[in-house]
Amino acid sequence: MAGAGPTMLLREENGCCSRRQSSSSAGDSDGEREDSAAERARQQLEALLNKTMRIRMTDGRTLVGCFLCTDRDCNVILGSAQEFLKPSDSFSAGEPRVLGLAMVPGHHIVSIEVQRESLTGPPYL
């Protein structure tokens, strides 16, 4: 994704999609905090829908595509995805392989980057 512009790195804390069951009583504010944190996380994910992402995987491959959805196991679905192989001593990275729709298992994700331009959107006239 050469020349695609600056990116913003997203990092997960304590597991990307973990959700704890809350056994809160009427006077328990911990349940309310968990609900509001879950709501904020959902809103942040919704804001990333249809944005261009670069996902680095444990085997060295990189996938670039449009973020379509995720699930509670942290699997990610990318649309219009392209796969870039990790360059090694025996060969250099060539043309990307077009995958189209791709599911990336959450346990293979090392990092996710979002293209900054796709976050702000193009200027409208």
From Swiss-Prot:
One Pfam family linked to the record: LSM
Modification Phosphoserine occurs at: 22, 25, 29
Annotated positions of the N-acetylalanine modification: 2
Coiled coil: 31-56
Subcellular location: Cytoplasm; Nucleus
Region (Disordered): 1-42
GO CC annotations, alphabetized: cytoplasm; NatC complex; nucleoplasm; nucleus
Keywords: Acetylation, Coiled coil, Cytoplasm, Nucleus, Phosphoprotein
InterPro entries per record: LSM_dom_sf, LSMD1_Sm, Sm, Sm_dom_euk/arc, snRNP_SmB/NAA38-like
Compositionally biased spans, kind Low complexity: 15-28
Family per similarity comment: Belongs to the snRNP Sm proteins family.
Subunit-level organization: Component of the N-terminal acetyltransferase C (NatC) complex, which is composed of NAA35, NAA38 and NAA30.
Protein name (record): N-alpha-acetyltransferase 38, NatC auxiliary subunit
Gene for this chain: NAA38
